[in-house]
């Protein structure tokens, strides 16, 4: 029992180390210091925070949807990272990076962890509007805005982190690696949007609970439709 409590405390200690001293944390990743401990701690903490937020947005429909979203939201972020990691790693290696895939994985997890912390910090706001604003489209758009804000912040951290980690690599190919990173960030966003659409529903609509919906339409048309309904165009 004491050992489990110690492990839980250790996980959050690692996360707080990232939040309080991001530069020092990234320097340790660049040097390959305690990578397994960092990876496990960030995975555990971010999964827990995403699960809490997922449960809140899913509770707009039913307890089953809350449970489903609590599971699917952490899976969404982790699967997006895993799908895009090989592209960033191998292209970077091809153009002079000397870092291991574990270092890239740890650096990407810092971004995911930052996103999870921001969403967790905004969870009371989402819960407040869930209770007081009984409008499905408004709640969806509010959370899309939260996802966009936290995602942009996380991607900014990621861009800075990967640039920092690669600063001592082959300088001749630095400009090329920067272009690859920018391209990869666009790819990461596109994969994330499509995967999120594939794993839906996270919120749930009126009717019976379903784990997954049929593949139809796309994320962007759905957002436009939600805006139109909120403004009374439909």
Segments from the language model and where they lie:
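Long, intrinsically disordered, low-complexity regulatory segments adjacent to structured domains
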Residues: 180-184, 188-234
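Juxtamembrane loop-helix boundary motifs flanking transmembrane segments in multi-pass membrane proteins
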Residues: 3, 7-14, 18-22, 27, ...
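A glycine-rich, hydrophobic loop/mini-helix early in the fold
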Residues: 37-104
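Hydrophobic alpha-helical transmembrane segments and adjacent short intramembrane/lumenal linkers
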Residues: 71-75, 88-204
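Sparse recognition of residues in long alpha-helices and their boundaries
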Residues: 37-38, 124, 215
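Membrane-interface helix-boundary motifs at transmembrane edges
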Residues: 30-36, 64, 168-175
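Amphipathic, well-ordered alpha-helical segments in soluble domains
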Residues: 18-21, 51, 86-87, 154-157
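N-terminal juxtamembrane cytosolic/stromal segments of multi-pass membrane proteins
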Residues: 1-42, 222-234
